[in-house]
């Protein structure tokens, strides 16, 4: 099974992440940031990953350190759980609507970290989470997991719906891209 555990402890955060890529969508999430808990729970469910994220962070400052470090820890868990990536599909692109919002997320599990994040939000906060931190989460995930990730919010009005469509599309793209579909490395170079 493709499982990995990460413990990340800094002066700003203490984080535990456990990820089972081949899980059933079970989530145990407690980040101290309610809206992020909601998004990570959706990510686990729609990606069919078993995901545990426990974070104690300096949210009295703001949410940035916790959000970024959670992205780092989940990215590290994803990269290591995949191992040598033998047999994975590698590529995926998914469109997901959430009411009036539509997002497209494309991924290449390539060992080449790159983020394109085309999404704008009208509000500064959703609950206790800064909308600026969503890009920071995905940047941290990309840099640590070493994937190429394109996030395109095509349209939408409600920021909650916009972000939810992004996270659901991200989850489905991760799931599809990491599916085992052969016994070969999906690269003409022979390595990912």
From Swiss-Prot:
Gene Ontology biological-process annotations: L-histidine biosynthetic process
GO terms, molecular function: imidazoleglycerol-phosphate dehydratase activity
Pfam families listed in its UniProt record: IGPD
InterPro entries, sorted: IGPD_sf, ImidazoleglycerolP_deHydtase, ImidazoleglycerP_deHydtase_CS, Ribosomal_Su5_D2-typ_SF
Cellular location(s): Cytoplasm
GO cellular component terms, A-Z: cytoplasm
Domain of life: Bacteria
Its EC number(s): 4.2.1.19
Catalytic activity: D-erythro-1-(imidazol-4-yl)glycerol 3-phosphate = 3-(imidazol-4-yl)-2-oxopropyl phosphate + H2O
Keywords: Amino-acid biosynthesis, Cytoplasm, Histidine biosynthesis, Lyase
Pathway the protein contributes to: Amino-acid biosynthesis; L-histidine biosynthesis; L-histidine from 5-phospho-alpha-D-ribose 1-diphosphate: step 6/9
PANTHER family: IMIDAZOLEGLYCEROL-PHOSPHATE DEHYDRATASE (PTHR23133:SF2), IMIDAZOLEGLYCEROL-PHOSPHATE DEHYDRATASE HIS7 (PTHR23133)
Family stated for the protein in its record: Belongs to the imidazoleglycerol-phosphate dehydratase family.
Protein name in the entry: Imidazoleglycerol-phosphate dehydratase
Encoding gene (name): hisB
